[in-house]
Amino acid sequence: MERLQISLPGLEMKNPVMPASGCFGFGKEYGQFFDLNQLGAIAIKATTKEARFGNETPRVAETKAGMLNAIGLQNPGLQGVIEQELPRFDDYDVPILANIAGSTMDDYIEVAAELSQQRNVSAIELNISCPNVKQGGIAFGTVPEIAAELTKEVKAVSAVPVYVKLSPNVADIVAIAKAIEKAGADGLAMINTLLGMRIDAKTRRPVLANQYGGLSGAAIKPVALRMIHQVSQQVDIPIIGMGGIQTAEDVIEFLLAGASCIAVGTANFTDPYTCPNIIRDLPHWLDRLEVQSITDLIGGSWNE
Amino acid sequence: MERLQISLPGLEMKNPVMPASGCFGFGKEYGQFFDLNQLGAIAIKATTKEARFGNETPRVAETKAGMLNAIGLQNPGLQGVIEQELPRFDDYDVPILANIAGSTMDDYIEVAAELSQQRNVSAIELNISCPNVKQGGIAFGTVPEIAAELTKEVKAVSAVPVYVKLSPNVADIVAIAKAIEKAGADGLAMINTLLGMRIDAKTRRPVLANQYGGLSGAAIKPVALRMIHQVSQQVDIPIIGMGGIQTAEDVIEFLLAGASCIAVGTANFTDPYTCPNIIRDLPHWLDRLEVQSITDLIGGSWNE
Amino acid sequence: MRKKQGRLTIVKQTEVARDSYELVLEGELVKHMSQPGQFLHVRVDESEDLLLRRPISIANIDPEKEQVTMIYRAGGAGTKRLAAQRVGTEVDVLGPLGQGFPLEEAKRGEEVLLVGGGIGVPPLYYLGRRLVENGARVTSVLGFASQADVFYEQPFKQLGNVHIATADGSYGAPGFVTDVISQQSLDFDVLYSCGPTPMLKALTARYRERRAFISLEERMGCGVGACFACVCHVENGQAHEYRKICTDGPVFPVGEVVL
Amino acid sequence: MRKKQGRLTIVKQTEVARDSYELVLEGELVKHMSQPGQFLHVRVDESEDLLLRRPISIANIDPEKEQVTMIYRAGGAGTKRLAAQRVGTEVDVLGPLGQGFPLEEAKRGEEVLLVGGGIGVPPLYYLGRRLVENGARVTSVLGFASQADVFYEQPFKQLGNVHIATADGSYGAPGFVTDVISQQSLDFDVLYSCGPTPMLKALTARYRERRAFISLEERMGCGVGACFACVCHVENGQAHEYRKICTDGPVFPVGEVVL
Ligand SMILES: Cc1cc2nc3c(=O)[nH]c(=O)nc-3n(C[C@H](O)[C@H](O)[C@H](O)COP(=O)(O)OP(=O)(O)OC[C@H]3O[C@@H](n4cnc5c(N)ncnc54)[C@H](O)[C@@H]3O)c2cc1C
Ligand SMILES: Cc1cc2nc3c(=O)[nH]c(=O)nc-3n(C[C@H](O)[C@H](O)[C@H](O)COP(=O)(O)OP(=O)(O)OC[C@H]3O[C@@H](n4cnc5c(N)ncnc54)[C@H](O)[C@@H]3O)c2cc1C
Ligand SMILES: Cc1cc2nc3c(=O)[nH]c(=O)nc-3n(C[C@H](O)[C@H](O)[C@H](O)COP(=O)(O)O)c2cc1C
Ligand SMILES: Cc1cc2nc3c(=O)[nH]c(=O)nc-3n(C[C@H](O)[C@H](O)[C@H](O)COP(=O)(O)O)c2cc1C
Ligand code: FES
Ligand code: FES
């Protein structure tokens, strides 16, 4: 399986496939369906300083080829994650990417400092883009200077490499990516969800209790590919690509666009075996494209 | 059919349904399928100063529940539109919304001044958001000050009301909408397409010759609804809503979000009878919702 | 690793009441199903415009034939498409999922009241069958909107007494299930219920201190506990306390969670 | 207003070569079809993940039975789904669309050469039938990738001489259609062709000054001239001059448009 291997800051991956943050809990649920050791890495649900309930329900809505979510970063909080969730990964040999979020810069710094020191945390994914948190969150992701400052602060305290997860709800994704690279990020994760809504024609009300939610799934794939294509040509740090990936063919598209590895979010809900199926199918695609290793494909749509 | 009537600046509409610019040519093609007089209005293809061929092909690509286009504003130019296209509407009794585009402010002004004086042009739709024009175009739509200036200039020369068509590829749609309202726009049209791409896994190349294109269709509906919901609560001018509308139920969602009328783009390609079918079905929805007129629904998701 | 996903074949699909379909699926996965009140997370079809599965309760199981029955209302886009599928088609099913009704709560000879509302009725049928097997005495109170919506009256009659209520009075007693319970002065040792939230609220108000169990609904993403879509608050719990309906429920003791 | 959309019923769907399907549809819309080289814009199914129709040429028409035949390669997502549809299913069709092959160009007794490549072969069959009816003498040169891809050899034989070429030499003459034309010194009064662009380019280079007509392909949106997706440049035209393949074509005189 060497053909699928990829080595990124903090993440020694057997293959380029990881479940996306928030779509795989803290791992145990899908562990009932397949052996998590098959995965290249696991991005776990966002951790905040305090335990959060998140938004009221309904928190998800279906859209054509996509879904909206407004979970609102529900999680057991920093101590809860450290005590209840992380120890379970002792039994596995798979790098963990710990997604972190907060409403103030201090929150982020505190969570990053402590979480990054835990065994089982291989890298930090800095979620500066969650569209469902009312205060703070969203602004971090749309202004290059603020994104850069947050990156710098978190890098300063983190014991492991830091990936910054970008919001697609911006006019100039390249400006933000470059600012974050300059601020010392080890990598980027893109994209988070597009802000959207549904209205129930019968009740005349927004379907989500929170009104707006993040759009994910196949619907957003073209936006994700475009942004990765733009950014990967302008930065030198690796990109974890995501947004609507369902199949190995989708993964090839993301690698060609410029991603170094990928994450699968919504598709886990449609089919819990999406990740292992992709991992099974990737070698056939390498054969078909007559390349030895997935690393030969990264950026292949523009660097050849 | 009075229940469906809506009166907007320059547009006295029998019903709130018009085909969207670029998806209905200059009308004659779909005139083979149904009587265009059924429509509330018609938004015709963008007119530029000079005739344009547009981008090379392939110019369209399919995506899940959506499509990408990179037509590149092909049109016969100002004189061509005036001489060959507009006279055909003499035979119809339906308001025409003339979409205009350009690469410089002067281009816009010249086209607006002349086109707005033509009989058969009821209002101007200022396309400041076409993502496929390389120079100029995109910047107009993402910076509030520039969008406002362009609006002001065009308003100054236009003989008919001016609707400004917004780009969704921005972080703060409300800021742009407010700047445009302040600059004197009579209405807004939203949304144009999201910038996206597809890569062909087999050839390893972007599917579109232009690499990037505009994403339209059902996939983008949640983004359109969210933006209209945000903007309609902050401006007092009417909004022409669009983005993925396929059915009368979709139209109800857009009216409830805050649109005063709607446009149908991509769905015409899937089913040429989409507009007349929606017009046929809307009264049933009014009955079901127990309202007399579509105007009772505008903004109904937030103003009740 | 216990197998939780499979492709089952449609062996029967019939409209049993207005817009309500009885769907019988056959396949190996049925082996793993036995707990009443659990649900299946059903993929509508292979096309990719409806990405989310639909949670539907198990209404009956025939272990011999490896068949499972669901009864569902074709209301929205997904269930309508499911209803159009013909015998012989394969359906992708995740399950059985969740914590069902606690059978062991009702001892041999005890009086059980099953209270179902509308499309909440189906899981009570398999529950009733299992309770009767265990020697409990079952009375069912089933509420529907109107006569056209009534289904499974006969099968429930084979389990014990059945009271039907319709909101518009077109069949059975007029009114709600709670009206019937009052009028008939029905009592019980254990109550199990599934139906619309207002009904569950009314039952909770009455029977908070009793041995009563209710099954809840919420919009779901994963159905397996991974996405946090389906949570509810805990009564008298801390602000961030929650239960997941998909894995902690859908059945809860009355009064445990906030409705 | 001429009716251009209809729901046709699948009466036959068979694999005639590797991944190539012959689809026969029946319905009233067929009445409006008569011109060889026109195409139908086919909606794959009712689900909403594939919004664009697929353009597929008319390969044959039976006006009596109101049946139209198409032959298509199940290559991508949409055509694969189409191929999975069973007899009895309805298919939503727009058409007939475009300008087909000019039948009147070949006079009674003239020599016609039909040159088809791969999945460009189908429209030539109905064209050939109509030409033979008109008294023209038809020779067909059909190129395929390999033996497994060959279809409709027998039907074409009923129209006149047939030469098959396969790129890998596994059947007929090895090489391309142009090799066969050279080796066999085939000449003609009128040539009609449909196939991959390199083939059309080679034919254009040879026969620019002759009575020759070629059918082009391009990705389409509307299929009816409204979206400007399918344009091509005009040879020696102005920079902004164009033809739309969906309405001005798909058939053009050789040399009219840039390939
Ligand atoms: C544990 C559980 C058991 C259920 N058992 C049954 C049953 O036995 N029979 C039955 O008819 N219904 C049952 N339901 C409700 C059923 O899931 C919904 O009616 C169905 O999902 C609606 O899908 P749709 O395609 O008709 O609607 P759409 O409007 O197309 O659905 C859009 C999205 O919203 C979700 N959704 C809409 N309504 C509901 C709802 N009431 N509950 C949960 N999700 C919803 C859908 O799953 C989908 O993700 C159950 C729900 C839960 C949570
Ligand atoms: C006028 C005309 C006549 C045609 N006649 C036939 C025929 O008789 N038999 C046949 O097998 N094929 C024919 N084609 C080609 C056929 O349209 C494509 O093979 C088909 O659209 C591919 O769809 P898919 O679902 O397999 O591929 P996908 O990759 O899923 O298609 C994605 C999108 O690209 C478009 N597309 C992909 N390839 C092509 C192509 N080569 N030409 C045009 N659009 C394409 C599709 O229409 C769709 O919009 C014709 C094309 C044109 C323009
Ligand atoms: C239910 C749900 C919860 C999510 N939670 C988080 C989260 O906690 N942190 C985060 O960075 N992204 C979160 N995301 C975003 C995903 O990680 C991913 O970026 C996005 O869904 C796009 O990928 P997809 O289209 O494959 O789902 C969430 C997405 C979904 C659908
Ligand atoms: C093929 C195509 C061409 C378009 N051309 C134009 C155009 O010339 N001017 C314009 O303002 N918008 C243009 N648009 C955008 C549409 O008018 C509309 O804003 C967008 O497609 C979203 O609506 P929909 O999802 O219903 O298609 C075009 C869209 C498509 C698909
Ligand atoms: S549905 Fe995902 S946690 Fe319950
Ligand atoms: S496909 Fe729309 S103009 Fe030809």
UniProtKB/Swiss-Prot annotation, chains A, B:
Principal location: cytoplasm
Protein's pathway: Pyrimidine metabolism; UMP biosynthesis via de novo pathway; orotate from (S)-dihydroorotate (NAD(+) route): step 1/1
Cofactor(s) this protein cannot do without: FMN
Enzyme superclass (EC): oxidoreductase
Gene Ontology molecular-function annotations: dihydroorotate dehydrogenase (NAD+) activity
EC number: 1.3.1.14
Catalytic site: C130
SUPFAM superfamilies, A to Z: FMN-linked oxidoreductases
UniProt cross-references to PROSITE patterns, sorted A to Z: DHODEHASE_1, DHODEHASE_2
Listed CDD domains: DHOD_1B_like
Gene Ontology biological-process annotations: 'de novo' pyrimidine nucleobase biosynthetic process; 'de novo' UMP biosynthetic process
Sorted UniProt keywords: Cytoplasm, Flavoprotein, FMN, NAD, Oxidoreductase, Pyrimidine biosynthesis
Cofactor, free-text remark: Binds 1 FMN per subunit.
Residues given in the record as FMN binding sites: S21, K45, A46, N99, N127, K165, I191, G217, G243, G244, G265, T266
GO cellular component: a single term: cytoplasm
Protein residues bound to substrate: K45, N69, A70, I71, G72, L73, N127, N192, T193
Protein's cellular compartments: Cytoplasm
Catalytic activity: (S)-dihydroorotate + NAD(+) = orotate + NADH + H(+)
Protein family according to the UniProt entry: Belongs to the dihydroorotate dehydrogenase family. Type 1 subfamily.
Quaternary context: Heterotetramer of 2 PyrK and 2 PyrD type B subunits.
The protein's role, per its UniProt record: Catalyzes the conversion of dihydroorotate to orotate with NAD(+) as electron acceptor.
PANTHER family assigned to the protein according to its UniProt record, in alphabetical order: DIHYDROOROTATE DEHYDROGENASE (FUMARATE) (PTHR48109:SF1), DIHYDROOROTATE DEHYDROGENASE (QUINONE), MITOCHONDRIAL-RELATED (PTHR48109)
Official protein name in the record: Dihydroorotate dehydrogenase B (NAD(+)), catalytic subunit
Organism of this sequence: Shouchella clausii (strain KSM-K16)
Gene of this entry: pyrD
From Swiss-Prot, chains C, D:
Gene3D superfamilies documented for this protein: Dihydroorotate dehydrogenase, electron transfer subunit, Nucleotide-binding domain of ferredoxin-NADP reductase (FNR) module, Translation factors
Entries under InterPro entries matching the protein: Cbr1-like_FAD-bd_dom, Cyt_c3_hydrogenase_gsu, Dihydroorotate_DH_ele_sf, Dihydroorotate_DH_Fe-S-bd, Dihydroorotate_DHASE_ETsu, FAD-bd_FR_type, FNR_nucleotide-bd, OxRdtase_FAD/NAD-bd
Superkingdom of origin organism: Bacteria
Cytoplasm found in the keyword field: no
FAD-binding FR-type domain mapped to chain residues: 3-103
Cofactor annotation: [2Fe-2S] cluster; FAD
Protein family according to the UniProt entry: Belongs to the PyrK family.
Protein's job: Responsible for channeling the electrons from the oxidation of dihydroorotate from the FMN redox center in the PyrD type B subunit to the ultimate electron acceptor NAD(+).
Protein name: Dihydroorotate dehydrogenase B (NAD(+)), electron transfer subunit
UniProt source species: Shouchella clausii (strain KSM-K16)
